[in-house]
UniProtKB/Swiss-Prot annotation:
Active site: 471
Protein name: Oxygen-dependent choline dehydrogenase
Native source organism of the sequence: Pectobacterium atrosepticum (strain SCRI 1043 / ATCC BAA-672) (Erwinia carotovora subsp. atroseptica)
Cofactors, names only: FAD
GO cellular component terms attached to this protein's record: membrane
Length: 559
């Protein structure tokens, strides 16, 4: 079969492109997805509070593992990636965070990326979004992505933890995606008004899947991209055990994410020549940056016992779960309708940082992100991690076999700045937790525990316990330097008819969760593919810290 466009990967970016390109009825699109449908009756992916479940199996999760990480006690660390219609938006934590305005302004200082400034990107964030409280200069009200804001009457620990951050001397913000990201405040989530996960399959594909010019093939594992010289002309893929090919008249659009996109490029003969020759892969184009510059967010949990019986601990007990499930299923309300990340914040840990370098997610229960190691008592925790680590990793294909996972090394914690930021983060978090707003709730420190105090003790805790925030990115970065893979429109350097459009093309990781920005990138490049005029630049005001101090004097100084 032949199509105008073939999209590889029905994830956060691929579904945006599929929906936008097929708005033109004379354009045909084939969307290939290695996973299955997003089964709407499967509570594991549809109930926000069940977000840990998809990470525990392989039905919706590629379940990659890293190579032994040399600065993390040689641990092989999780690298979960979504599999199925929706991609990682089908299994993520549903935090709707866009990044800091300064992230995009920094991108725009790079050669060839001048139109990626915050004010250039903001109209595309707005285009994608329907926020439940309506539109303003920063938010949309008619986009495919449903965004829900925290409501009065939610867990009181959210409010106490935000208040504690403010009492510790940090700013308060009423919108982490609005005028000012820096500070503590409520956190939006990608959840529908009926309490369902708002993946890009629900938001974008539901609008597009009935169109006759869109063909969606699930359980289609991409083998390689096909070339005629330097031009992409099709895709070879497996449907079960059957080898299939499809031809592309215009372009192949690679949207497989920061792990699989470089893997597919390399397997197709586009990447570092030495690696490809070592694996007996015919070199189509020597492009050394493919798979390099890999970045992620690392985070830790600081956990506390809760003296008041107000945490979500009872919701973890099996005998309470049928009632929670029924309320969610029939009413779309209650504990099940929230991801429980309803408060958080961004701060600068030192004056040398010109925009926030530390992120917080507050959670009114003590448990690991993947649902393991739940504390068997009332508790709460702060997830804290650095935002723009200087550590750089890589993704490398291991063989020609499409079913073999690649070699992944993030090289976490490879610089002294990493260690300084995480030590600072733990000590600052302890100051926040010691503020009067939490006196009523705060019991003993469960993890890391008050015995862990010196730099050496903190470092060992970090090495042993820090985990991925599941934000791999930047492995096919856009730009014009020698290690760039694509230009500012996603076109692969030195090739024709081939783009990469996903989190892998970020030149530097953003300050926050990646899903919203990945959707924005796809919306922006969709206009380029369609040769449309970009949306007019926003004129919204936004906060720049400048010489503003990192914090005011805390209400309760560190003891």
């Amino acid at each position: 079969m032949e199509y105008d466009y073939i999209i590889i990967g029905a994830g956060s970016a691929g579904n945006v492109l599929a929906a936008r390109l097929t708005e033109e009825s004379d354009v045909s699109v084939l969307l290939l997805e290695a996973g299955g449908p997003d089964y709407r009756l499967d509570f594991r992916t549809q109930m926000p509070a069940a977000l840990a479940f998809p990470l525990q199996g392989k039905r919706y999760n590629w379940a990659y593992e890293t190579d032994p990480e040399p600065h993390m006690n040689d641990r092989r660390m999780e690298c979960g990636r979504g599999k199925g219609l929706g991609g990682s938006s089908l299994i993520n934590g549903m935090c709707y965070i866009r990044g800091n305005a300064m992230d995009f302004d920094h991108w725009a200082t790079m050669s060839g990326l001048e139109d990626w400034s915050y004010l250039d990107c903001l109209p595309y964030f707005r285009k994608a979004e329907t926020r439940d409280v309506g539109a303003n200069d920063y938010h949309g009200a008619s986009g495919p992505v449903s965004v829900t804001t925290p409501k009065m009457g939610n867990n009181e620990l959210f409010h106490a933890m935000v208040e504690a951050g403010v009492q510790a001397g940090y700013p308060r913000t009423d919108d982490l995606n609005g005028y000012q990201q820096e500070g503590f405040g409520p956190m939006d989530r990608t959840v529908t008004p009926k309490g369902r996960r708002a993946s890009t399959a629900r938001g974008y594909l539901d609008q597009a899947k009935s169109r006759k010019n869109l063909t969606i093939v699930t359980h289609a594992l991409t083998d390689r991209i096909l070339f005629d010289g330097k031009r992409a002309v099709g895709v070879a893929y497996f449907k079960g055990e059957s080898a299939q090919t499809a031809k592309a008249r215009r372009e192949v659009l690679l949207c497989a994410g920061a792990i699989a996109s470089p893997q597919i490029l390399q397997r197709s003969g586009v990447g570092p020549k030495d690696l490809l020759q070592r694996l007996d892969i015919s070199v189509v184009h020597d492009l050394p940056g493919v798979g390099e510059n890999l970045q992620d967010h690392l985070e830790m949990y600081l956990q506390y016992a809760c003296k008041e019986p107000v945490s979500l601990y009872p919701a973890l007990q099996w005998f309470n779960q049928p009632k929670i499930g029924a309320e969610w299923l029939f009413n779309g309300t209650g504990i099940g309708a929230s991801n429980q990340f309803e408060a958080g914040g961004f701060i600068r840990s030192r004056d040398e940082f010109t925009w926030p370098n530390i992120q917080y997610h507050f959670l009114p229960v003590a448990i690991n992100y993947n649902g393991s190691n739940a504390v068997k008592e009332h508790g709460f925790q702060a997830h804290v991690g650095s935002m723009r680590s200087l550590s750089r990793g890589r993704v490398q294909v291991r063989s020609k076999d499409a079913r073999e996972h690649p070699s992944i090394l993030f090289n976490y914690m490879s610089t002294e700045q990493d260690w300084q930021e995480f030590r600072d983060a733990i000590r600052i978090t302890r100051e926040i937790m010691a503020q009067p707003a939490l006196d009523k709730y705060r019991g003993r420190e469960i993890s890391p525990g008050l015995a862990v105090q010196t730099d050496e003790e903190l470092d060992e805790f970090i090495r042993t316990h820090a985990e991925t925030a599941f934000h791999p990115s930047c492995s096919c970065k856009m730009g014009e330097d020698d290690m760039s893979v694509v230009d500012g429109q996603g076109c692969v350097h030195g090739m024709e008819g081939l783009r990469v459009v996903d989190a892998s093309i970020m030149p530097q990781i953003i300050t926050g969760n990646l899903n919203a920005t990945t959707i924005m990138i796809a919306e922006k490049i969709a206009d380029r593919i369609r040769r449309r005029q970009p949306l007019p630049r926003s004129k919204a005001r936004y906060y720049v810290a400048g010489s503003t101090p990192v914090r005011k004097a805390p209400l309760k100084p560190a003891s």
